[in-house]
């Protein structure tokens, strides 16, 4: 729980923007992968068994990471603000974002959609911006403890 006078730690319109980027990704991925087939010609060079295995690995790993990150932050009632730097937050400073992008990567690999990969690059840049903004706010709030965490744990992987 943050003090009442503490500025919002999320970037403005972060939630709505995430929904917009996810929608764009899914529309492009589904349209290209199942209807238009404009940029999926590379799928013929990668056996479906390999694409399916990678899809399974990326989506399960990303989904698990995102879920565990969500549970670590929102699944526990806290009386005071706490720097969560253990569990999946000991592997990545932004495991929820990383989990979402890993699931998206699994979808891209499953159909080899270049168009969806380009959108995923945009999603990454967006999440990189969000992470930078949030880290600036977290350094303001937690100070040297968060700076030490940043030195110890990478932003992504």
Where are these regions (language model features)?
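Membrane-anchoring alpha-helices and their flanking helix-loop junctions
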Residues: 1-85, 99-157
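Active-site His/Glu-centered metal-binding helix of metallohydrolases
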Residues: 96
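Conserved SAM-binding loop
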Residues: 92-93
């Amino acid at each position: 729980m943050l003090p009442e006078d503490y500025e919002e730690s999320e970037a403005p319109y972060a939630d709505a923007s995430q929904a917009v980027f996810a929608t764009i990704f899914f529309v492009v991925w589904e349209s290209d992968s199942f209807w238009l087939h404009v940029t999926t010609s590379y799928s013929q060079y990668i056996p479906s068994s390999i694409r399916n295995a990678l899809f399974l690995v990326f989506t399960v790993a990303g989904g698990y990471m995102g879920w565990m990150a969500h549970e670590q932050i929102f699944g526990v009632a806290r009386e005071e603000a706490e720097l969560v730097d253990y569990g999946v937050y000991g592997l990545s400073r932004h495991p929820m974002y990383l989990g979402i992008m890993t699931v998206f990567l699994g979808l891209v690999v499953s159909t080899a959609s270049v168009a969806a990969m380009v959108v995923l690059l945009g999603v990454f840049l967006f999440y990189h911006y969000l992470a930078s903004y949030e880290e600036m706010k977290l350094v303001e709030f937690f100070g040297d403890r968060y700076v030490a965490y940043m030195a110890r744990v990478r932003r992504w992987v």
